[in-house]
Amino acid sequence: MNKHLSGSQIRQIWLDFFKSKKHEIIESKSLVPINDPSLLWINAGVATLKKYFSGEENPINPRLANSQRCIRANDIENVGVTSRHHTVFEMLGNFSIGDYFKKEAIEFGYELLTKFYGLNKDKLYITIYEDDNDAFNYWVGQGINPHHIIRCDRKRNFWDLGSGPCGPSTEIYYDRGEKYDPNKLGEKLFFEDIENDRYIEVWNIVFSQFNNTGNNNYTELLRKNIDTGASLERFACILQDVPTNYDTDLYLPIIRTIEKHTNHKYVVDHYFSKDQSEQDVLRAFRVIADHLKCGVFAIADGVLPGAKDRDYIIRKLLRRAFVYAKKLNAKPEYLVETINVIINTYSDFFKYLIPNKEIVIQAITNEANNFTKTLDYGFEIFNEAKTTNNITAETIFKLVETYGFPLDLIKELSAEAKIKLDLDGFEELFKKHQEISKANNGEVGLKKQNENLLKFKTPSKFFYDKNNIKTKVVAIFDDKFNPVDQIEVGSGWAVFESTPIYATSGGQRFDEGYCLKKGNLVVHFDNVIKAPNKQHLHHFKKASFWLNEKVELMHDENWRKLVRKNHSLEHILHATLKNTISETIKQSGAFKSAAKATLDFNYPTRLTDEDLDKIETKMRQVIADKIPVTVHHVDYETSQKMNAIAYFEEEYKKHELLRVIKIGDYSVELCGGTHVDNTKEIEECFITNLYSLGAGRWRIEIMSSYETIYNYLVDKQNEIKQEKDHMFNELGNYDLTHYLDFSKKLHSFNLPNSIKDLRKTLRAFEQIKEEYKAIKLELDKKKTKDRANQIKKLALDNLEHKIVLLFFDKEEHKALSIAHSELVNEKPDHLFFFINKSDNKINYLIGIKNATYKLNAKLLIDKVNAMFGAKGGGKQNFAQGGFSTDKDVGKLKADFVNICIT
């Protein structure tokens, strides 16, 4: 066994081995799934390749391999307790998309494990699906002892999500020896699937060969696949012969850094200790190392600590790390130094960590500083609980989920203070929470393969530079993608030999496109998408097409021109953000249409209005410089030398020519969209908005062209005029004696005369609107108080009886409530009964401060409920309720008077 191998070497051996087996090495993708709402995180190596397994796209090579960073945050309470639990980890994988299958996958696995990693074949143990005789024979053929192979049921060795691709699997285990078998159970641990640290699963291979229609009806897949996953951390643990994953060179440098700033020691051999205090120290170090590493990786991928979804998960993990650091009495300096060590440990492979280092440090230290008060609050709860000797389930849950307190720390502090915990109640709350989280987390499900589209290989060429093309129909599909020869006045998809109509791709919306027959416009396509083999699928409704029919296609040239302007402007915006704000900014999403373009990006703080002005000024300069926009078709190496930017999940084909859009020396990006020929064609630009998409995520909205921006300016002028008129009309109902300055300011506010003044004008108008809201609130409060005083006077004029019964018609509820409350306090021996009729709804308030047995609010509310079938309730001093009725006012008054005198 190669004990000298480092984690980096283990990873590289994996990638080099599969490269030698003609696999394409796929770079590790972002932890944030792109265009996949089913996943919160990339949680497996196959997750970034789903489009290939589903058949939505064909890969650049049917053989793929990777080392993918992943996050799984479902069982964070196990981190540091078990030898192998992590929230962030690397999954090594090799994949076959319709290429090699079971025999080759097993051969590759055996060869890599025994010849390259040097594992003893006699220590390999295998699980297979109970009916998979082929897998059994292949393993035995490689030299595996048949006694080391066990057949398992569907639950353990059949991968099936209920519908879509599925199949049997085989798992590879390694026997680490008796020192990890304290009870000397031997092979029983493996054969009875007992949780242990001796027989460690290192590799799982799924043979995706069936399609489940959804009702457990299985058919053979047209394209059989191999999906594998192996843990780099587990390989390192085995090959470096250490007790746990945390004792490998992937984690120990991080732990040693934390250790320097505490009075505690991380002793690897304490793994074998039964002393609980020693185990607690080990766990604390491991949790801090794991959670900080997870935070570093996620934040560098654009996820900032926040209040919901993945932002909340990172916040919770960081806070757990901070709590454990406090438990170890770690000095504040530990944090930044540990972050630096994490980045240094992994940046040789994960190069994206280095340019994002400052943002990572800033985000984590900010979270630590903000959490200090929260941490203190948590400890205050324990001090308060000492007086009651009890902490409720709800409080425990709040500490764990909201404040990030580890449950074991809560137990420890409670034991020290002799405080009782409602752990049963907490477990019930936590179980419900986990069920919700699991439902929302998403599985690595693969969509059902569409075999018709996968098999469809007939070429169809897209022409960027043609407005219209005479062509013919080469394929027709119904709405379920079944191939047909023709469709008569119906809906479906048509594929043409050639097309000038752009299909939705790379964030650019499809062209407005049309089909002409014999010179007459007959079809407007309402959607255009790409098939797995890149043909453009044109969707139509209430139209007729048949195979080999000759037609003419065209796109709306005016639409295309506007899209080209906005797409090129979006590239300029992207480059300007990098040049003006921060080189670390990267596009995380984009949308381009004729009306506008948007760009999503990650940045810790909101851009100021001054930032936006600066960005806009620079973009206008680029437009004014009349820079040529050129298209280059180059190989991958050349695109790298050009420093071409490429994001998202596109696998830019390393064996094909790539399309690079170059805007002089200002912007260079790989892009398949449509663009202007020169920046002067963009004419003008304006940033219409900056939206927050959550913690640290932003969307800038921009538009181009004189006409579009002029129309936007006119719309804004009309909006401002309408809002001014509305404010004047509203304020006309009030006495503005004390607000003359604001009235003059509103009257003199000028509408913007040019687009360059618009942002400044809009900012000023937003301030006016805020001022208006504050003034309106004051005026409404005064109006309500004045009306309440009038109601009070009316009541005070009717104190001859102990019950003051007053009727109101469509009276303001707030004024009634204020008057009623003040009267009850000022005249404690009187009962005030206010009835307010609005349309067919009756609402009433009853109150008396000095209630008696014979005169109280509860007595009257019960009578009202009985007489009218009303829903009301309260206590002796105060009650309220309501009901619906169509009785006239005179009859109602008589009924209420009768209630009061009986």
Curated annotation (Swiss-Prot):
Consists of three domains; the N-terminal catalytic domain, the editing domain and the C-terminal C-Ala domain. The editing domain removes incorrectly charged amino acids, while the C-Ala domain, along with tRNA(Ala), serves as a bridge to cooperatively bring together the editing and aminoacylation centers thus stimulating deacylation of misacylated tRNAs. Its cofactor is Zn(2+). GO terms for molecular function: alanine-tRNA ligase activity; aminoacyl-tRNA deacylase activity; ATP binding; tRNA binding; zinc ion binding. InterPro entries: aa-tRNA-synth_II/BPL/LPL, Ala-tRNA-lgiase_IIc, Ala-tRNA-ligase_IIc_anticod-bd, Ala-tRNA-synth_IIc_core, Ala-tRNA-synth_IIc_N, Ala-tRNA_ligase, Ala_tRNA_ligase_euk/bac, DHHA1_dom. It comes from the Bacteria. It is found in: Cytoplasm. HAMAP family: Ala_tRNA_synth_B (MF_00036_B). Zn(2+) binds at residues 567, 571, 671, 675. GO terms for biological process: alanyl-tRNA aminoacylation. Belongs to the class-II aminoacyl-tRNA synthetase family. CDD domains: AlaRS_core (cd00673). This is Alanine--tRNA ligase. It comes from Mycoplasmoides gallisepticum (strain R(low / passage 15 / clone 2)) (Mycoplasma gallisepticum). GO terms for cellular component: cytosol. Its EC number is 6.1.1.7. Gene3D superfamilies: 2.40.30.130, 3.10.310.40, Bira Bifunctional Protein, Domain 2 (3.30.930.10), Threonyl-trna Synthetase, Chain A, domain 2 (3.30.980.10). PROSITE patterns: AA_TRNA_LIGASE_II_ALA (PS50860). It is an enzyme of class 6 (ligase). NCBIfam families: alaS (TIGR00344). It catalyses: tRNA(Ala) + L-alanine + ATP = L-alanyl-tRNA(Ala) + AMP + diphosphate. Binds 1 zinc ion per subunit. Catalyzes the attachment of alanine to tRNA(Ala) in a two-step reaction: alanine is first activated by ATP to form Ala-AMP and then transferred to the acceptor end of tRNA(Ala). Also edits incorrectly charged Ser-tRNA(Ala) and Gly-tRNA(Ala) via its editing domain. Keywords: Aminoacyl-tRNA synthetase, ATP-binding, Cytoplasm, Ligase, Metal-binding, Nucleotide-binding, Protein biosynthesis, RNA-binding, tRNA-binding, Zinc. It holds the Pfam family tRNA-synt_2c.
